[in-house]
């Protein structure tokens, strides 16, 4: 028995998406967002699906691909301060179950939004642009890459 030895991760960002119940909470939050948008009376169903998709993808982009460092003061802050949350996740390993889940969820939401908007051209373009903006940074080829120097520091 190790008395007085901490058993937590050095950087909690690396394992947060592997926590128990986090995927279910993620799905419930997206469902709640959709229900809140459906409760607004002057939004049509296609607009609600497009808004759900765009808000989800915008939030995912901000929290996973623009915010850098850790929200905690950790011993590895020197290394993690230049990495986004996506780059820190699962210690930088590609194709883990958490990364697959976070890559598939925008695609499923995109397919649902496309179906319920009946592939209307305007909604389709907005949903496709939103999907590409959140899916491209997740590719392994973009790990650590800062396009046009955006978010370099």
UniProtKB/Swiss-Prot annotation:
Gene Ontology terms: biological process: ceramide metabolic process; intracellular sphingolipid homeostasis; negative regulation of ceramide biosynthetic process; sphingolipid biosynthetic process
GO cellular component, one term: serine palmitoyltransferase complex
InterPro entries: ORMDL (IPR007203)
Major localization class: endoplasmic reticulum
Signal peptide: none
Annotated membrane topology: Multi-pass membrane protein
Compartments, record wording: Endoplasmic reticulum membrane
Residue ranges, Extracellular side: 127-153
Regions of this protein lying in the Cytoplasmic compartment: 1-21, 64-105
Function noted in UniProt: Plays an essential role in the homeostatic regulation of sphingolipid de novo biosynthesis by modulating the activity of the serine palmitoyltransferase (SPT) in response to ceramide levels. When complexed to SPT, the binding of ceramides to its N-terminus stabilizes a conformation that block SPT substrate entry, hence preventing SPT catalytic activity. Through this mechanism, maintains ceramide levels at sufficient concentrations for the production of complex sphingolipids, but which prevents the accumulation of ceramides to levels that trigger apoptosis.
Domain notes: Ceramides bind to ORMDL3 N-terminus and stabilize it in a conformation that physically restricts the accessibility of the substrates to their binding sites in the serine palmitoyltransferase (SPT) complex, hence inhibiting SPT catalytic activity. In the absence of ceramides, the N-terminus is flexible and permits substrate binding, thus liberating SPT from inhibition.
Subunit (UniProt): Ceramide-sensitive subunit of the serine palmitoyltransferase (SPT) complex, which is also composed of SPTLC1, SPTLC2/3 and SPTSSA/B.
Assigned protein family: Belongs to the ORM family.
Name of the protein described by the UniProt record: ORM1-like protein 2
């Amino acid at each position: 028995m190790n008395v007085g030895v901490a058993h937590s991760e050095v950087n909690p960002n690396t394992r947060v998406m592997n926590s128990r119940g986090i995927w279910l909470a993620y799905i419930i939050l997206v469902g709640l967002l959709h229900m809140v948008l459906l409760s607004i009376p002057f939004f049509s169903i296609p607009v609600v699906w497009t808004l759900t998709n765009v808000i989800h993808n915008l939030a995912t982009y901000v929290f996973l691909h623009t915010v850098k460092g850790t929200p905690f003061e950790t011993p590895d802050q020197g290394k993690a301060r230049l990495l986004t949350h996506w780059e820190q996740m699962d210690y930088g390993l590609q194709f883990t179950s958490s990364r697959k889940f976070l890559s598939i969820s925008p695609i499923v939401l995109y397919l649902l939004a496309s179906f319920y908007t009946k592939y209307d051209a305007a909604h389709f373009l907005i949903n496709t642009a939103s999907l590409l903006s959140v899916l491209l940074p997740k590719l392994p080829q973009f790990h650590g890459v800062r396009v046009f120097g955006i978010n370099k520091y």
